[in-house]
Amino acid sequence: MDVAFDLVNYAYASRLRLLKEMQERDARRKLSKKEAQHHMAIVAAQNASRELEIAQQQRAGKEAQLYQELTSLNTLSSAALDHHHLHIERLAAEITIRGQVLDDARIAQEQAETAASETKALWVKRSEARHKWQQIQDDLRRAVDILSEAAGEIEADDEILLRYGRGSLDQRSRNEFR
């Protein structure tokens, strides 16, 4: 929202600056929350990756154990073979589930990263707006100070002129325009 400098008074600029500060703080809070969620999503993806790796190692170990038993024994009962096969299938199903959990965690991580990035962009925008209105308020404060100083100098000059009987500058300027 751009407002012409000469149309803005100090109180209005001060209120807008305070509003922009509140909006910036709100955006900073949201950014902090989104960054925390992004961090949690990263940790969740790392954990899911680790769990998938463990499940794959367990399956590989169980398969190696089964093949070792098959090669060491010439005969393996059908029940024992079915038991090992069932256990390997359960481990394969667990790997599939862990893989899906990892995929979901990576998707959540990407979404959290996108949300954090968007929230950071909003915070930057709000921060720039607050700085802009802070600058406007500072400029207005300087302008008011300059005007007050000029008014004080004019008043002092008028007092000096009145003491010496010449009349005020305001009276002279009014008389000149008549």
UniProtKB/Swiss-Prot annotation:
It comes from the Bacteria. Keywords: Plasmid. This is Uncharacterized protein y4yJ. It comes from Sinorhizobium fredii (strain NBRC 101917 / NGR234).
